Amino acid sequence: MNPAVRDTYGPADLSNNPVFAGGFINFGHWQAIDLDRPLDEADRIRSQQDLYRQVLRAAALPDEPEILEVGCGLGMGCALMLSECGRATVTGMDIHPEQLQRARDTHADLLRREPDRLRFVRGAAERMPVAGDGFDAVISVEAAQHFSDLRAFAEETSRVLRPGGRAAFASFFTVDGAPGRPGELAALLDTFANGLDIARPVQQLADALTGAGLAGVHVESIGRHVWPGWDRWLSRWWAPETWPRNFLRAYERGILDYYLVTAEQPR
């Protein structure tokens, strides 16, 4: 496991940081939230839920879907799926054992009530501990920036998707493969400097999905609905000159963007 991932999601427990109120640990999709008024915790939680909803809509789920979430964290998204996606069956997978224990503790009542609809398993995106052809959808929300090998992730996604199943991923990537991008981001953002986030172009993921045999690969920029709201929320704790505020600057300078990437397993 990447040491930065181990520490951030283990002893440091990023979910306890108030910038991630509600425990979803994503930057949020802010389109439906008025950014011209003071933001509160309810807005923040909704932004994170709405990012999941964008991904789930893009997954075009069938009735009673079986869904795998890669990088489930505390499982807040898994619980949202159970409440909003009909009779969904959800497997939440995460590489970090401490995160999985927190997920099981957080959702202990739900696991008792719905033992056949929700489970949490430990596994890496590049080597998923689940059977092939087992899922109608594979989703991932703001985790792919940590994955060490996008090609292996794509191959595993293809392996576990049923014919006609869909993949839907949301995360941030560089806008292109210019050789200077990693250095630019490391100079702006501590999470790239310390190796927690990996600077790669979104096209690398798209090509990996195509190479793994998936069809209809589509890349959509959703940064306009992510970065301004995220920066407004960060401004409650971080001054303009501090490094977290550089996410918006990296977007405005055309270095980094936030994407929704989808693909389908041919029938």
Predicted segment positions?
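N-terminal auxiliary segments of SAM/dcSAM-dependent transferases
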Residues: 1-23
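Conserved alpha-helix/loop element of class I SAM-dependent methyltransferases that forms part
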Residues: 29, 46-63
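Class I SAM-dependent methyltransferase SAM/SAH-binding core
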Residues: 66-127
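A short acidic, Gly/Pro-enriched loop at the edge of an enzyme's catalytic core
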Residues: 126-138
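A short glycine-rich, Lys/Arg-flanked "PGG" loop and its adjoining helix->strand segment in the class I
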Residues: 151-166
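Short, glycine-/aromatic-enriched active-site segment of Class I SAM-dependent methyltransferases
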Residues: 173-195
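Short alpha-helix
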Residues: 197-213
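Conserved catalytic loop of SAM-dependent methyltransferase domains
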Residues: 215-240
